[in-house]
Amino acid sequence: AIRAASGLSPLAMDGGLSAAADARCESFVAGGAFDHSGMTTRSEICAAGPIGSASSVCSYWQNSPAHYANITNASFTSMGVACWFCSTAEGQYTYWTVTFN
């Protein structure tokens, strides 16, 4: 819906990009740096914390200029998605990653 509102085509789901997103979430859960230094795709957006739903994290990304720019980048044609849940010292966390190409 976000891309359509900007006059853009929807992104196709890509299994390879989803595998890359999954690997990023796994790295975060294992204690890897929560940044974009390990990115292996053209672009990615990530979120972490006690975020309980996909709609909550999507609202966050939509209201963040940098994340919104990735979602509405006209050069992207495909995406992959992953989400991992884990227990931390701060409580239950969810790690979300969307990769783009």
Please report, for each region that a protein language model flagged, where it lies by residue:
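Functional surface patches built around histidine and acidic residues
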Residues: A1-N101
